[in-house]
Amino acid sequence: MFVNHSTVARWENASRLPDAAMICRLAKCLSVDVNELFQLAARSKENPNVIVVDDSKVILSDCLSVLKEVIPNAMITGFIWPLEAIEYAKNNRVSLSVLDIELGTASGLDLCNTLLEINPCTNIVFLTAYADYSLEAWKTNASGFMLKPLTAENVKEQLKKLRYPFSIEGAYK
């Protein structure tokens, strides 16, 4: 069986998915139970889990509305306090984290590093009113950077650029 990086990448971004026969062959090659792979495939269709962290309740509310419009199948949760977001990420697989950089006395850059320690496959997109932070933000392995206010168009563009794409069925069609 021939599977290369581009094959796996197409599976990951859901532009091409393995059929049942391919999953059976993969299970044999990997010496795993085929049912385990089918269960993993079913879970990959789960709704993405998105968190937003911003210390402004007004901005947080606006962000949640925009994200719900663009990714209607996502479970979207907002946090004002970074520690609450960390606890949530420890107990839930987060697909996308939208983080303000200035979080009162806390730093969104530090929060990014903590979230990536919890799950290295979390997509981090920074959202800030200050373009000056862009260079620092890129040093964190973030997937993207957006300036406030958040717009549906900006979110759509960022979703195309995620390091770890996830299923966005029904999103912005």
Label each region the model flagged.
Residues 104:
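The feature encodes the CheY-like receiver
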Residues 78-96:
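Acidic, metal-coordinating helix/loop segments flanking the phosphotransfer/catalytic sites
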